[in-house]
């Protein structure tokens, strides 16, 4: 039984209900509820007051461990009192606390798991009393998770490993003391150590997959996610089954757990309990998911104050960094300790043929089955270089894992990596050799990171461990993102992934010094969180590291250049018009040579894939490939390649004609095709690819009277097709109609009304004032691709809107929950394009429902003509570009630009304030 220490924590005494007042006969709720209500008056309010007392005690600095134990004791006393009230203590029943409550751990709104155990079948009278007890518990607001079982029923139920886990935590509160050890005996009878270990490990693996197998989710579940409380519980479950202990600290006395490991687990558990307390307090329920809704407030409650020089998100980012570090420590210890249990308890009991065989690698290391192990316990102390040598051997021998006694020694040895260690030429050679060895590189670096080797060898890497940017775009911490990037680089030499990355894979396989890219990956984000330009700061740090490790100036400078310009290619491809030869030429000038281009292309594709799983798609892949190919032609001075505007137009027309000749084109006359193309204008062939040109051409020519004689009375043409290569629910929409001033605004309003997100937009005006608008959309409802009625509705809505071009009607939708917690300042900039006499307007603002419809409405009000748009959504940020002019295709005046900017900011600000 726990010591509640009520006086020390100053909890409010229980009102009226006490065992001293229970001398009268127990009352049935169904016969005399008035006396019961009088006796139990105030208990719901008392329970709320207890929660308030606990919260105030936490504010005063009382240890959270005391508080979760104190609340468990309070509930103990209440349940014991009620058990007596209903005279259940005069039966053969035993009342057990199980699960977390059995461990004596209750947060404000934790589940109260209880078991009523009977040696035989429960009679009707006892069953009635139990029903009354349960009803009362619900009436006073406890909402218990109650199981009522006989011993035989419990035996059968324990075949479910989740119930067996709860029984392992069973703690007798009151009742039949002869049943005190029965729950544990049942588990021991029903489960062998090996079977129970296997099922709990399988459960943990399944649980990890539900949370993307990472500790670094943006809104982590602090109970069930990797690195959550469940990872501590699993250590207790598998070990308690064997050692028959009740507390985690008992494992220290069993020499299974070291004092330091216990302290680390205990501290991390307390940190999560504190977060959990505030989650329960803020939500008023058993909430374990650390949503954006609560992260800022919990950071403040836990003392993460914003400093005068801080960025707006600094405090919450510090809080989440500490959470992620805590989660990584828990998951690492949990994995190590469960493996240690297998190696020391399960493995020795296996038949000889199933036990891993030991084979010497050298004087310092052995291979034990599929693991590496030090040959004796003094290896790291006597041979410090063996820390890095071990990881190199793992790559050379194809060994993925490390024995736990070696991991324990490694963790201690890693603390001794200091500047003298880093300056040792032998150690430097071994570290670079590790990066050159591609076999299991990700897994080796991951182990280095988790056990302190990487952070001590590269101190700057330790600074970004657990560092998360508070946004929806960056899905992982900097260290996790960096290691994922290196993992993706390795996939470029894996035949299984060649189909996903054909061009990148072929380029990467031709690069001889692959460690150049690995080093660039290691350093590309290493200066985040310091303030200033992280790319430039990282360049300096990477060059210093490479030179200190004996690399040539050329190699060091290439690593530095890649670190500095790692965002250049993705930003150019996504934010600029790469159909413009001047844009590509400027990019080529910055890149300088094909070697730089090849390395940058590979690094950029890997970086985008490792940043956010939703970021990479065939649309972005096409943009990147297009920019790479065009730049490579310029850098190679390919005289046959189109390098100027007219050459690119001619090349696209030629490619489209070749495709036309290779398909069934009986519905298209070649002369009519060429005549139509002459009407479409040069801009069209600069911006569209040959495949889409062929699709558009066939649609136009087979839609009379547009195809043969376009005129002002021609009906609008709207055609759709799926674009699954881009995304599962992607739809391509092509519009060909008489140009009009509000076409963009009307189109965006219709898309918004039908819950369609715009990924890309190309707005082109043909020579005869016909608009050729092409859009790539994402269907939020997922029905447009499969529902012909929805397709027809979209077509008809657009056609009706084009025929009746009144001011578009905007919808008012609630902003998604996650977006509400981000403050993105709206910024608008203009750049004049001499070649087109148009302004390029860049808009950065909070992504929100109906954003483009609102922008289109402002364009309509300000009499702005849209010629092209590039739509980019990066998490919570919308970063869009529009090529605009006045309605006479003339450049906008300075006053007009100022008015437009003011109108846009005002429109978007009003909308943001209202949702």
Curated annotation (Swiss-Prot):
Q: Which domain of life is it from?
A: Bacteria
Q: Where is the HD domain?
A: 478-594
Xref: SMART domains: HDc
In what way is its activity controlled?
Answer: Uridylyltransferase (UTase) activity is inhibited by glutamine, while glutamine activates uridylyl-removing (UR) activity.
Q: Which SUPFAM superfamilies match?
A: ACT-like (SSF55021), HD-domain/PDEase-like (SSF109604), Nucleotidyltransferase (SSF81301), Nucleotidyltransferase substrate binding subunit/domain (SSF81593)
The record ties this protein, via Pfam families, to: GlnD_UR_UTase, NTP_transf_2
GO MF annotations in UniProt: [protein-PII] uridylyltransferase activity; phosphoric diester hydrolase activity
Tell me the ranges covered by the ACT domain, including all copies.
Answer: 732-817, 840-915
Please quote what the entry notes about the protein's domains.
Has four distinct domains: an N-terminal nucleotidyltransferase (NT) domain responsible for UTase activity, a central HD domain that encodes UR activity, and two C-terminal ACT domains that seem to have a role in glutamine sensing.
Q: Which family does it belong to?
A: Belongs to the GlnD family.
Q: What is this protein called?
A: Bifunctional uridylyltransferase/uridylyl-removing enzyme
Biological source species: Psychrobacter arcticus (strain DSM 17307 / VKM B-2377 / 273-4)
What gene codes for this chain? Answer: glnD
């Amino acid at each position: 039984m726990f010591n509640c220490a009520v006086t020390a924590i100053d909890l409010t005494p229980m009102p009226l209900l006490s065992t001293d007042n229970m001398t009268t006969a127990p009352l049935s709720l169904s016969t005399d509820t008035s006396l019961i209500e009088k006796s139990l008056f105030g208990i719901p309010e008392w329970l709320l007051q207890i929660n308030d007392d606990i919260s105030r005690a936490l504010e005063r600095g009382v240890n959270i461990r005391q508080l979760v134990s104190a609340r468990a004791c309070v509930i103990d006393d209440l349940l014991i009192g009620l058990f007596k009230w209903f005279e259940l203590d005069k039966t053969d029943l035993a009342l057990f606390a199980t699960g977390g409550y059995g461990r004596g751990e209750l947060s404000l709104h934790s589940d109260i798991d209880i078991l009523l155990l009977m040696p035989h079948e429960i009679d009707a009278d006892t069953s009635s009393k139990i029903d009354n007890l349960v009803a009362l518990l619900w009436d006073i607001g406890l909402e218990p998770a109650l199981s009522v079982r006989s011993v035989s029923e419990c035996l059968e139920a324990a075949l479910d490993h989740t119930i067996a886990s709860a029984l392992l935590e069973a703690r007798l509160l009151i009742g039949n003391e002869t049943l005190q050890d029965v729950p544990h005996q049942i588990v021991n009878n029903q489960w062998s150590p090996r079977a129970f270990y296997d099922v709990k490990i399988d459960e943990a693996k399944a649980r990890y997959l539900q949370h993307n197998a990472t500790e670094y989710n943006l809104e982590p579940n602090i109970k069930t996610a990797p690195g959550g409380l469940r990872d501590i519980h699993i250590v207790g479950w598998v070990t308690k089954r064997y050692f028959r202990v009740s507390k985690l600290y008992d494992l220290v006395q069993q020499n299974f757990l070291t004092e330091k490991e216990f302290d680390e687990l205990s501290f991390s558990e307390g940190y999560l309990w504190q977060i959990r307390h505030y989650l329960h307090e803020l939500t008023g329920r058993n909430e374990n998911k650390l949503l954006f809704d609560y992260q800022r407030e919990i950071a403040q409650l836990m003392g993460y104050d914003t400093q005068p020089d801080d960025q707006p998100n600094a405090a919450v980012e510090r809080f989440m960094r500490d959470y992620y570090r805590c989660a990584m420590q828990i998951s690492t210890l949990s994995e190590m300790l469960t493996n240690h249990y297998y190696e020391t308890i399960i493995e020795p009991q296996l038949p000889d043929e199933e036990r891993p065989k030991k084979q010497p690698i050298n004087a310092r290391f052995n291979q034990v089955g599929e693991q590496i192990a030090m040959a004796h316990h003094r290896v790291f102390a006597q041979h410090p270089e063996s820390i890095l040598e071990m990881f190199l051997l793992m790559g050379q021998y194809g060994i993925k894992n490390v024995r736990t006694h070696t991991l324990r020694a490694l963790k201690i040895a890693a603390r001794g990596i200091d500047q003298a260690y880093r300056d040792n030429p032998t150690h430097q050679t071994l570290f670079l050799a590790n990066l050159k060895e591609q076999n299991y590189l990700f897994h080796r670096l991951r182990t280095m990171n988790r056990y302190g080797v990487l952070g001590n060898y590269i101190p700057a890497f330790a600074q970004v461990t657990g560092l998360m940017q508070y946004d929806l775009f960056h899905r992982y911490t900097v260290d996790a993102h960096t290691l994922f990037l290196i993992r993706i680089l390795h996939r470029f030499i894996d035949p299984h992934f060649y189909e996903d990355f054909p061009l990148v894979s072929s380029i990467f396989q031709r690069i001889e010094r692959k460690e150049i890219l690995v080093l660039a990956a290691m350093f590309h984000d290493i200066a985040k969180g310091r303030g200033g330009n992280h790319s430039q700061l990282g360049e300096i740090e990477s060059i210093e590291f490479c030179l200190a490790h004996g690399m040539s100036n050329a190699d060091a400078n290439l690593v530095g250049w890649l670190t500095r310009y790692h965002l250049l290619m993705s930003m150019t491809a996504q934010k600029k018009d790469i159909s413009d030869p001047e844009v590509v030429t400027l990019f080529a000038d910055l890149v300088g040579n094909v070697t730089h281009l090849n390395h940058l292309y590979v690094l950029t594709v890997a970086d985008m894939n490792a940043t956010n799983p939703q970021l990479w798609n065939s649309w972005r892949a096409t943009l990147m490939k297009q920019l790479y190919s065009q730049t490579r032609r310029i850098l190679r001075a390919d005289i046959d390649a189109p390098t100027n505007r007219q050459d690119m137009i001619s090349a696209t027309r030629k490619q489209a004609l070749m495709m036309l000749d290779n398909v069934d084109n009986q519905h298209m006359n070649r002369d009519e095709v060429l005549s139509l193309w002459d009407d479409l204008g040069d801009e069209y062939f600069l911006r569209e690819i040959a495949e889409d040109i062929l699709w558009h051409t066939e649609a136009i020519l087979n839609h009379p009277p547009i195809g043969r004689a376009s005129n002002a009375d021609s009906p609008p043409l709207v055609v759709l097709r799926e674009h699954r290569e881009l995304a599962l629910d992607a739809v391509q929409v092509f519009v060909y109609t008489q140009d009009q001033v509000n076409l963009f605004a009307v189109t965006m309003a219709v898309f918004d009304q039908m819950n369609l997100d715009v990924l890309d937009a190309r707005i082109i005006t043909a020579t005869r004032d016909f608009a050729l608008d092409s859009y790539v959309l994402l269907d939020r409802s997922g029905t447009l691709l499969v529902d012909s009625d929805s397709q027809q509705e979209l077509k008809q809505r657009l056609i009706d809107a084009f025929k009746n071009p009144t001011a578009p009607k905007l919808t008012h939708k609630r902003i998604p929950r996650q977006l509400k917690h981000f403050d993105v300042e709206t910024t608008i900039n203009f750049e004049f394009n001499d070649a087109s006499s148009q302004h390029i307007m860049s808009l950065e603002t909070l992504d929100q429902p109906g954003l483009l419809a609102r922008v289109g409405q402002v364009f309509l009000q300000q009499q702005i003509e849209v010629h092209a748009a590039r739509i980019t959504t990066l998490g919570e940020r919308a970063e869009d570009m529009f090529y605009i002019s006045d309605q006479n295709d003339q450049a906008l005046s300075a006053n007009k630009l100022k008015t437009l900017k003011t109108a846009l900011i005002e429109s978007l600000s009003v909308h943001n304030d209202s949702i």
